[in-house]
Amino acid sequence: MDSILKNIFLFLFALPCALSGQTLFDIRVDTASIAGLPGLHSFAAATHEGKWLFIGGRIDGMHQKFNAFSTSSANQQIQVVDPLTGQLWQRPLSELPDTLREQLHSANMEFVQQGGTLVFAGGYGRSEVAQDHITYPCLTLIDVPGLMDAVTGGGALQPHFQQIRDTFFAVTGGQLQLLNDTFYLVGGHRFQGVYSANSGTNILQFYTNAIRKFTLDSVGGAWLVTHQSAVVDELNLHRRDYNLAPQIFAGGETGFTAFSGVFQPGLALAPFLNPVEIRPSGHVPVEGFNQYLANYHCAKVPVFAQADNAMHTLFFGGISQYWLDANDSLNRDNRLPFVKTVSRVSRLADGTYEEAGFDAELPFFTGSSAEFMLADGIPTLTNGIVDYDALPDGEQLLGYIVGGIV
């Protein structure tokens, strides 16, 4: 289980009828590959005109207990992929200055795309400048169309990056989302030193326990960070390597849900099971519901069915403390193994939540630290939420699961 998935999963969405007011759908998974694309995980991704941009992450699979997160196994290329033709373009990060290059080959960074800009925060990796493994105190703004043109056409790379240094962004394993021009940097931790079994006291680690908000302004072609703030919750936000997904809540308000994640304070290898709803006005833990089947960052996609006022979030594989057997009985494994489970968490019209596993499974124990790339032309609502009601009847290619640890 220390390799990386080099195939791409084609995720197909089947839309049958509705039953008893609850929208039903099924899934099918197939595989494809892009020649020359390395196995990636824990990377950043963006899209433009049907093509994909990948930056950072790892190519060595699950980190080992010793000599983890070495530079030699970092993704040191910028990749542009055309999923329709299978064409791949790559350019080395070595063409960039040290301080920029080092952050860009980090892992577990936070990222979100705003129009043509990829906002890339933090990340963990080896810094030759600092002579240590660090969480990068940087926010980097990336011109996606310009960079993709440079990668595919041989132009200069550096003009398409702007880096801002600020310890506010020294976070790894968190999540970054955007709502109404405000960025939400949620959860995660800061880790300084070598991540290994014998790190001992030679490390510094602390969880942010926070929702950090900020805005960006462009002045004279340069980006400025404005209006920083933070809300700290040492219980409910003490999580990393989790899933944060855009949501439409029962009353129609948009926001996010922080799902599961690791680790509960004071408990060894105990994931969070309760989600947290995040709105502009604040955050509230979901009471009376546990998410059992996806406890770690994995490929995911949010789907809203307006006719039923139901918000579905689909999760693909990853790591989980629980799994379903052939009889749909819930089994527990405190070692938190990799799983093949495909599951959904649904917010129903009355505001309650339910979780269910699909009959289909992933063909490998993968999905952890993978990314879901929507197929071009899929109808979406705010923040990339799939518009279920606008999808045609029958089977539909919804998107692709790229990378992940096997």
Question: PLM features: residue spans?
Answer:
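Loop/turn-rich, solvent-exposed surfaces of beta-rich toroidal or solenoidal domains
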Residues: 293-392
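Beta-propeller domains
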Residues: 23-34, 43-95, 123, 127-138, ...
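Asp-box/WD-like beta-propeller blade repeats and closely related beta-sheet repeat scaffolds
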Residues: 101-108, 125-179
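Blade-edge beta-strand/turn elements of extracellular beta-propeller
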Residues: 23-33, 86-100, 145-167, 214-235, ...
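Residue-level signature of beta-propeller blades and closely related beta-rich strand-turn architectures
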Residues: 58-60, 124-126, 189-191, 262-264, ...
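Beta-propeller blade signature
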Residues: 68-87, 132-150, 198-220, 270-283, ...
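Beta-propeller and closely related beta-sheet repeat lectin domains
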Residues: 41-45, 102-111, 172-176, 240-245, ...
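Entry beta-strands of beta-propeller and related beta-repeat scaffolds
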Residues: 51-55, 117-121, 182-185, 252-258, ...
